[in-house]
């Protein structure tokens, strides 16, 4: 991650343009519009969530992204939007913030690619206030044996081509195991159940609260 993923950052927004105009527009609106108070977004990527903060109750927004190439694109997007969002280059596993310092933490398609899933979730739990919300949208391990097997088989290739993406992670279980209670759990299937897109299904959408 120190060197980043230059080619992936270069194609990401174009690759996702169709989804951004379709289902992702509604997902991002739901996740981000519900943010309130002091907000931390981990793994901001190219800043696709940024436009949606205008309609939220966020008082301040800090966005982190470890990849320098993704971060550069996020900075350019932020300049175009002219929004008061603070950007920092830092991984989710090592957040440089005080305990219980955020009212909301946001992540969209982040937990598949963090280097240490449990470590990242512990950090999110640490910086979130006791009555705060962790609002997330992630793609996760299939609940069907054949789908999960396919994810396991292609996981090494996905990690190489997809900027460290691991499609076979049971993110929901990891979140619950890190001291959160899932409150609005929804399992979504925006992609058809055919290879290769089926590797990224299902998706989960939720608001989690600290236990």
For every predicted segment, state its role:
Residues 135-157, 162:
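Conserved class I S-adenosyl-L-methionine
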Residues 186-211:
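Core SAM-dependent methyltransferase catalytic element
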Residues 104-116:
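A short SAM/SAH-binding and catalytic strip from SAM-dependent methyltransferases
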Residues 164-179:
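Short alpha-helix
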